[in-house]
């Protein structure tokens, strides 16, 4: 499924827990709160040049909303949310929703479906090459003096006499937009509007995430 026709949901990472199968196996899952997703704008081919649904999640004080955004939301008749995202969809999908309509989780996801989850990874601060790029440490002894966790040589010979751009070195790690692909939906809680996804997803507790139908789901299933 391509991004051009996949409606997703915005949510907040609640935390992790585990579920038990009928066989007694423990399955680690991440709980995502996807309640209160509502449409702020329906974009059409005639008016905007492409078809999409603009969705907001959560709630925010009116004093925290910029004037342009406040006018946009007032026109839609929608309460201000904490984040706004846009999903490219088909004209058929866009026709199912009107401005201000709620998007329940059962409309988008089902148990066993593959999803991609995008969020902001946990910031780790300044990190070395071992942690940042998964490089191997050097020898602990046997002639190694104070060079255990250094990257080693970073340069070339006299020609070209410089470090090439893109060389993996130390630097800031984390706090970046990250996507984890092909995760399984284990449970859909319609009553509480919760999505239980197998495994870990990017970000810390309370962080915002975007959940979409998996882009590479068909390719991965066909490979098996």
From Swiss-Prot:
PTM description: Methylated by PrmB.
InterPro entries found in the cross-reference section: Ribosomal_uL3, Ribosomal_uL3_bac/org-type, Ribosomal_uL3_CS, Transl_B-barrel_sf
Location of N5-methylglutamine modifications: 158
GO biological process: one example: translation
Entry function: One of the primary rRNA binding proteins, it binds directly near the 3'-end of the 23S rRNA, where it nucleates assembly of the 50S subunit.
Subunit structure: Part of the 50S ribosomal subunit. Forms a cluster with proteins L14 and L19.
NCBIfam families, per database record: L3_bact
Name of the protein this chain belongs to: Large ribosomal subunit protein uL3
Annotated source species: Paracidovorax citrulli (strain AAC00-1)
């Amino acid at each position: 499924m391509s991004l051009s026709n996949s409606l997703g949901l915005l949510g907040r990472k609640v935390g992790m827990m585990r579920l038990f199968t009928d066989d007694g196996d423990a399955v680690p899952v991440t709980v995502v709160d996807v309640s209160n997703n509502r449409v702020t704008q329906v974009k059409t081919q005639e008016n905007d040049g492409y078809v999409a649904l603009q969705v907001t999640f959560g709630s925010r004080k009116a004093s925290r909303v910029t004037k342009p955004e406040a006018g946009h939301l007032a026109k839609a008749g929608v309460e201000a949310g904490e984040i706004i995202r846009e999903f490219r969809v088909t004209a058929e999908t866009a026709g199912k929703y009107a401005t201000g309509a709620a998007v329940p989780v059962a409309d988008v996801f089902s148990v066993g479906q593959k999803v991609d989850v995008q969020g902001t990874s946990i910031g780790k601060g300044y990190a070395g090459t071992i942690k940042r790029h998964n490089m191997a440490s050097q020898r602990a002894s046997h002639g190694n003096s104070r060079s255990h966790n250094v990257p080693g040589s970073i340069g070339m010979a006299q020609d070209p006499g410089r470090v090439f751009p893109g060389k993996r070195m130390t630097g800031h790690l984390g706090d970046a937009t990250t996507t984890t692909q092909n995760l399984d939906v284990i449970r859909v809680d319609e009553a509480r509007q919760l999505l239980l996804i197998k495994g870990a997803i990017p970000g810390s507790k309370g962080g915002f995430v975007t959940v979409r139908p998996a882009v590479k789901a068909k390719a991965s299933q066909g490979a098996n």
